[in-house]
Curated annotation (Swiss-Prot):
Record organism: Oleidesulfovibrio alaskensis (strain ATCC BAA-1058 / DSM 17464 / G20)
Family in the record: Belongs to the universal ribosomal protein uL14 family.
Membrane-crossing residue ranges in chain numbering: none
Swiss-Prot/TrEMBL keywords: Ribonucleoprotein, Ribosomal protein, RNA-binding, rRNA-binding
GO cellular component: cytosolic large ribosomal subunit
Gene it is expressed from: rplN
PROSITE patterns: RIBOSOMAL_L14
Protein name: Large ribosomal subunit protein uL14
CDD domains (alphabetical): Ribosomal_uL14
Amino acid sequence: MIQVESALQVADNSGAKKVACIKVLGGSKRRYASVGDVIVVSVKEALPHSKVKKGDVMKAVVVRTAKEIRRNDGSYIKFDTNAAVLLNKQGEPVGTRIFGPVARELRARNYMKIVSLAPEVL
């Protein structure tokens, strides 16, 4: 469950390390985002000479949440951290690698590029 001001790690090699959610997309009253949802983020920490700079405002898709997700078979999955992958204007990942596992729910949301780059899909 990600809301405005939530801090997330960046799970790609775009150069950003930490981001903060500044808006949850999908309706004016929408408060929370879960795995597979698109949010607007501000880069809070970035590596020097990288594709993104501190202060950049971008869209990102949530790939891991510390809050558990209930699946249709009744099982739950949760991760240790909140993490997101930065997206460009066309909705494609900015980075060329994904770090750490991602949730299977991304496949249902048609983020095939992220699923194929991820080392593990849980």
